[in-house]
Amino acid sequence: MFEDSSDFHDYYRTRQGRHVAMRLRRTVGDFWSRAPNACNVAIGYPPPVLRTEERPPVLSFTPMRLGLRPWPPKGPNRSALVNGRSLPLQNVQLDRLLLVHALEFDPSPSRLLDECWRVLDGAGRLLVMVPNRNGLWARAEKTPF
């Protein structure tokens, strides 16, 4: 079981982890809003699936229980530790919200989803990436799936 952001970081540095991240980045790439004033946020452990060159920039929020790893590795930090039950955002503020490695590790996933709906704009979109608990990778101890 992955306990903190260091576990995720170490996994995504492996050959298998880099391959998974590349495939997830392709999926997520078209999801982000490209509008000049768009507000895009990712929650969980999103750095492996984010591109530093996204415009407008994406913010990375990590739940407090995982601990924070600064992101991106170069340039101004765009990551923060957050409480999933009280996101530091205004109501109906976000254009896009990505959850990756968030729901499966949250002790109260329904409360996290409620908070997501609170901060999403009426036309906003939510993309939730969760592992298949019946899949082969879910049975492996060395993956976050």
Feature names for model-found ranges:
Residues 1-34:
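Class I SAM-dependent methyltransferase Rossmann-like catalytic core
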Residues 14, 75, 142-145:
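Short glycine-enriched, charge-decorated loop/helix-capping segments at active-site entrances
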Residues 26, 30-87:
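Class I SAM-dependent methyltransferase SAM/SAH-binding core
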Residues 33, 107, 121:
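Short conserved AdoMet
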Residues 85-97:
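A short acidic, Gly/Pro-enriched loop at the edge of an enzyme's catalytic core
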Residues 95-110:
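A short SAM/SAH-binding and catalytic strip from SAM-dependent methyltransferases
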Residues 110-125:
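A short glycine-rich, Lys/Arg-flanked "PGG" loop and its adjoining helix->strand segment in the class I
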Residues 125-145:
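Conserved class I S-adenosyl-L-methionine
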